[in-house]
Amino acid sequence: VKLKLPDDNATDASYPYKLVNPAAFSLFVPSKDRTPPNIAAPIPSVCVQIVQGDDDLLQSARDIKIRLCFSAWDPGYHGPDIFKPKGDGSGTYIQQYNEAAASYFVKNGEGWRDAWNFVDTALRLIENAEHLGDLRVIKEKGITFGPVTEQDAVPDFYPYWFAWAEFSIEETLTRNPKSYQHLL
């Protein structure tokens, strides 16, 4: 997935936006001044959070509910966002790279599609995975997802867009006190 890198000071055609792979964070998304040096910006990103864990002591299993928080930035259509049919009957589309495309910008509220394409890509990967590392995806619990809401309403953070997905994983619950006794 490649998404637009935000530039909070530019929302017109003069901004030659850059596409980047989203950053990944655990627990929280750091502020712009606290991002690691190799990360251009905290958005676009996915943040992995542990929501809840349950140990089944009789089955020696641990279920962990994971929440993925997705963020994207998109103030509107820039010229290179628009693809035109190639015109040779192949069904192929080509990206515009010309002077007219470079100066084209329409501010709109369609940037939510970037966040949802990001979510959809992650959902497909999770749905098709049996395991994530040595953790089993608990498919029988399903996946839930939605837009970020406040008091049951989707807040307007234009040009930033947010969504989430939750699923459960399982690991074998093993206790080996010798391996961590020295830490107690």
Predicted regions and their residues:
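Oligomerization/assembly interface segments of phage tail-like spikes and tubes
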Residues: 60-81, 85-109, 122, 157-175
